[in-house]
Structures are given as structure tokens and as C-alpha cells.
Amino acid sequence: MKRKSIAPSKSPADPISPDPVSGVRDGDLPAYVSNGLVGLRIREVPLLAGVAIVNGFAGVHPERRIEAAAYVPYPLALDIGVGEAWLSHQPWAVDDLEQAYDFSTGELTSRFSLELMGNRLLVEVITLASRSHPALVLQETTIRSAKTAAIKLRAHVDPAGVRGRGARHRTATPGEDEPVCDGSLLWISEGNLSTCGIACVSRCESAEEGKSGGDWDWRGPLNTHYCVDAAANSEVRIQQIAALVPSVIHERPDEEAVRRVAEGARLGFQELRKLNQAEWKDLWRSRIVIEGARAEHQRLVDAAFFYLNSSVHTASPAATSIFGLASWPNYHYYYGHVMWDIEAFCVPPLIFFQPDAARSLLDFRRRGMEAAKSYARLFGRDGIQFPWEAAPLSGQEATPGAGSGAAHADHVSLHVARAFSLYAEVSGDQRFAAEVAWPVLAGVADWFCSRVTWTDRGAELRAATGPAEVPNPPDNDSFSQMAAHEVLGRAVRLGQFLGHRVPATWNAARSSLYLPRRSDGVIPSHDDFRANEEKGATPSPLAGIFPYDFPLSPESERPLWSSFWPDGRSISARRCCRRFIPCGQPWPATGTCPSSCSRKGTPNTTLPGSTSVSNTAWTIRTPPFQPGRSSPTSPACFQDCFSV
């Protein structure tokens, strides 16, 4: 695709959207539109079916035969016809392809021309996934005809290429004289692991003949037909709304999808679009602004913020995968499994951007507690051990094949426990801390103490890989040990705060953790580490410093940084310092945090109580903790200070 450069945003409230692209994708991936419950991969001709994923909908993977996220029929397909010529029959009649993604609203706009029966049609398509009504995805298509013509439209749910089967297909609404929507479909995944309900409604005001649906075959496609007598240079507009509900949320999901799409039809496309724009405007109040850096750095930060927030929602029943809900046949995308990256790197910022969504991610792990207990017992260990690759539906281990990562990458449980602790501390929700976070922290602490081997050197972690997955698991992965130091400390502090009797083994293990060191004092990645070994360049010990908080003196920290970046800038002080400061208490550099932090405050300015992260090159500013509609009370603010 060719890119058309655009100027960066001038308002601090406006993100930098990607440059518009033109032409065919070639090897590029299609656009990704998602709200955290429904994810779409949208082709450069968006009316042709792409890929649709629904959070929590799972099936048997066609190749690996494991539980995995599964495709559902594409809900926003549309065919355009003139006479006997249709877009779907001759897609090569398309030209002038353009796409633009507006990060400020989450809307994808696609344009193309289409030559049918000697008539040139100009087509514009707006596609979005509703954040205010997360079961809904929407599309508006505007067609301008160069000549007077009878334009045929066929809105349909396209199951082509999707493994699984339709179990129920309705175009009428039982007990109603008039159907409340165009129709509904109950889709069963391969392996019968779960079902998904899809309901759709469409509207084309200029269609003189009204609309007609195909109920000739209850197993057939769900489609609605229109015919419009369009004058030359006039516009024909069709709006489509589809609801998608997984069975993990509702046992009869097609019926619930009908109710959801009926509410969407009542509100209408434009109102839903306005509500979605308002949701994104609200989210962008938490935009991270880098002052003094080049525009491409801010562009990357905006893209990361957008895609992270696109991939999570309060309504997400199965957390999210490391690729969100973006899937395409070119790659396995880790089968939609939930892995340690989510708790280590996604939950902490989401506690501030979308606290309700962060809670939803943690709820997935909470629902998997029994599976984690059984998994620990399977290894002969105490407590709870979370799986390396958690299946989206069952929450159980689903690593394909021999599963070497599942057998030896034990650090995943530490990240999960830390994420629960962070949410409890930042939110100030004591009920969450006592009823939700404490069982997780206590279970992981018990597990870790049963996992280590006690030697004359201390508590050693034998045969455990860190972030660098290698065939032969080493002993005493330093990142895992540093993470355990923090998690055990958090478990002890929370237990004492709640008045529990903390097992002595937790403190004993924490104070006795064996951490390998070279003769020059540098902490290597693990025992017998060699820089030229497979994946030896992975700087995993640095992650023990940030985002983890392993205590090292500046004298010990400098050579550790230099061992990975010998030609880089020296670190003159501890790179990362993290503190929780309750609302209303003074901040070192920015004054006083307001007693009630809210997303409704003035965005993207040096707010009292905002985070100010500085080094010699640039400053990052973010607003303070911003509770959502159902966030816990008594929030606390979080500060990161960088010194380089």
C-alpha cells in the first residue's frame, strides 16, 4: 500500500492517526477494528468478508487440535449489484482503493470505485466497533452512481471459510407480528466447545421496494436484499448493525443478540456513532504526551495506546491475548491464548486508562482459580499455578505440542499475582484486596515456596525459563527470582494489613532467594549464562528493575545496564522509582493531587497530581488515576520518576 503523509496533530487532546493508505495491501495485514468484545480484520474492500473474532468464543484449532479462539461468520458483509453484475462475482472491477483510520474516534473509512455494467460507482464505507454498546459493530456504506441505475444491495452475515456450523437461523421473531431485526444466527464452533449468537439489522431509506430477507433455508446465509432506483450522481446509503454474543456470557446467545441489536436499531447508527465518539474522547483524556521527542515517537505511543484500549473492555469475558482480537490466516496469533504479557505489561497502565477493563482482565484469572489449583497439584505443588497459555474458554493450559513453555516458564504466576496486588493498591478497594487479591497472592506465594529448592546457597529456582524461552531451562533465572522477591513482599504486606497470620516460609524464601552474580557484581540472566547462547541478548534482568522493583544500589545497577548496552548512556541514578501517593497528599514536583481524581478533568495539561516523567531528552505527562463508571472508591495516584 502507498501511504499519504499527513501532518501530526496540533492539539494535545488529538492523537496522531496513521497516514492514509492507497492501493492493494500486498503483504500488509488488514485493518484491525475492535472494542475488546468483538474484533474485525477488515479488507481494503471492507464489504468483502474479513475475519471476525468474539472474545470468549472458542473452538478446536483446525491444525493443532487444542482449544483456541475461533472465527465467527463475518457480520458486516455487503454485496453491490447492477443488473446481473455483482461485486462478489467480479471483485477485480474495484479500483482507487483508499483507507484511513481515525484513532480519535476508532472509525475506519474506506473508499473505492466499482465498475459494473458500464456504470462507475464511488463507494465510501465507515466501520466501527461500539464501545458504548460492546456487542455491536456498525457499518455505513454510501454509494454514488455516475448514471441512472437500479442498484441492488445484499447485506449478509458471511460464513464462508469459517469452520463450525449454523444451528439455528431465524428471520422472524417468535410471537411478534413483525420481526424486530433482519434475522439471527446461532453458530457452533468446531469441536462444539462454544456457541455465538449473531443478529443483524439494516436500513436503506432510499430503497423503494423495501427490504426482503431470505428464509428459504434455515441453514442458509442470513441476508437482506434492497433495490434502489438511483438517479445519476445521487447517493444511496445503507446502514448495518450487528450484535455478537458468546455463550460464555449468555446460554442462548442468539436470542440475547436479537435483544442487543434491537436496542441498537432503536438508537440508530448516528446516535451509536456519537456515543462511540464520546467514549473515545473520554479515553483520550488519558493520552500520554511526550514533550520534546520526535513526532514518530509520539505516533508510536498513540498507536500503542489506541490498540491496547481497543482490545480490552469491561464486557470482555476472556481477558485478551497478546494480539488482542486481531487474527488473520497468516499466523497462529498464539491461538488467542492469555499469556503472562497481559498481566505484566497491559494491566498496570490499564488500571489508569480503563480501570474497569483492567478489573475484567483480572476477573478472567479469578474465574480460573480452580483450574490453577488443579494445575499446581498436577505438578505436585501447593497453592495455585497459572497456565503458560490459558485457553480463552476454560482458562486451562492449552500450549500446543510438547509444551516446554508450560513445563518450565513458571514466572507467569508471579505476574498474575502482582497485577492483582497493583489493582488493589491503586484502587484502594479494600473489599477487592481481601476477597479477590489476597487469595491470589497467598496461593501464588504458597506455590512459589513449594516450587523452590532449598540449598546451602538459599532458595533456588531450578529448571525454569524466563522471558527468553530456550530448549534447556536454566537454573535460577534472575528475572523470575527478582519478580518473586517483589510478589512475596506484596503477599506479606497484604496479609499483615488484612490481619492474617502470614506463613513464615514466605519471608524465609524472600530473604533467602538465590540470585546469581558474576565476579564483577553484575547479575546475569541465570546460572552459567553466556552472552553468545541462544537468546542471550534478552535483557531480562533489567525487567527486574523496571517494571519490577528489585532493590539494587546505583553501584550495582550501573554495571547491569552497561552489560547489555556497553555503548549506551551511563545510568547515573536508579532509572525507575515508583511510589503510590494517596490523593490529597503533596507531590514532589507538581503540587497537590486533587481529592477526587476524575477522567472528566482537564486533559493533557500539567494537572495538579498528574504524573511527570522526565529525563534529559523528553517529558511524559499523563493524568492521574481516573475511575470509570463502576470503579472502586478511594483511588490513589501512581507516580513514575525517571532519572537518566
Predicted regions and their residues:
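Contiguous, well-ordered alpha-helical segments that form the cores/surfaces of helical PPI scaffolds
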Residues: T142, D302-N309, H332-G336, W340-I351, ...
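Helix-terminus loop motifs that line ligand-binding clefts
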Residues: V312-N330, D356-R418, A424, R431-E435, ...
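Active-site core of glycosidic bond-cleaving carbohydrate-active enzymes
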Residues: Y335-G368, R418, E435, Q481-H485, ...
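Inter-helical turn/loop segments and adjacent helix faces that build the functional surface
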Residues: I151, V248-E255, R287-E291, F352, ...
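Acidic/polar, glycine-enriched structural segments that form the non-catalytic walls/loops
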Residues: K2-V33, L37-Y334
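Acidic/histidine-rich catalytic neighborhood
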Residues: W447-R501
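Active-site-proximal structural scaffolding
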Residues: A31, Y71, P134, R219, ...
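Amphipathic, well-ordered alpha-helical segments in soluble domains
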Residues: Y74, G106, V412-A419, V444, ...
